[in-house]
Amino acid sequence: MLILTRRPGESLYLGENIRITVLGMQGKQVKLGLEVPGDTTVYREEVYKRVVEENRRALETSNNDLMVAAELWHETKK
């Protein structure tokens, strides 16, 4: 993990197209501003983890459904 120190008003770039600016700090919270291309999706970590888990469950369900359908199809061919 790369650790950087920035003050309010200072920025950093990720590649050429993503700029992150420290807007302010209050207590234990840091307010960040992100300038990203329109085709770039930005998620908070907890939301991203939820999306990944939901996608995993959906894929698992799809695979299970496919296996059941294949078994039923195989039984009808007998």
Curated annotation (Swiss-Prot):
Subcellular location: Cytoplasm
Keywords on record: Bacterial flagellum biogenesis, Cytoplasm, Repressor, RNA-binding, Translation regulation
GO biological process, one term: bacterial-type flagellum organization
Pfam families: CsrA (PF02599)
Subunit structure: Homodimer; the beta-strands of each monomer intercalate to form a hydrophobic core, while the alpha-helices form wings that extend away from the core.
Naturally occurring in which organism (per UniProt): Desulfovibrio desulfuricans (strain ATCC 27774 / DSM 6949 / MB)
Name of the protein in its database record: Translational regulator CsrA
Family in the record: Belongs to the CsrA/RsmA family.
Transmembrane parts of this sequence: none
MF terms (GO), sorted A to Z: mRNA 5'-UTR binding
